[in-house]
Amino acid sequence: MASSYTMSFSPPMQITTKPQSPIKSGTNIKITAKLAVADPTGNYMAHADALDANGQEVNGVLKGQLAASWEPTNGGNAAETIVFKFDRMNISEPGSYQIRIQAYKQVAGGINQLTKTTILVQVIA
């Protein structure tokens, strides 16, 4: 049976706004990422989660807006660049984390993961 989830990491995401470590636990984190896409009329989404220093997902420490709003930047032309904005996130516990940003495109029968990246952050009390 074919899976509706496939991964193709061709276009890298460019992080244009990210937190500067160290940050205090509970402080608002803003992240902006740009991604070049071939289909400007597609339906795109991005999601954030927290990983520990070993790359294992840590549930419950990253709070707030974990799904990004997005907008096209050049009017729907081919080779569009879209911008994902995470404006209201925070990490509730001190420690060393990676914030993983994953971008997806909705397709018939599911979603395709387009790319992912991580941002290292040190969180203090």
Residues of each region from the PLM?
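Beta-strand-rich extracellular modules
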Residues: 102-106
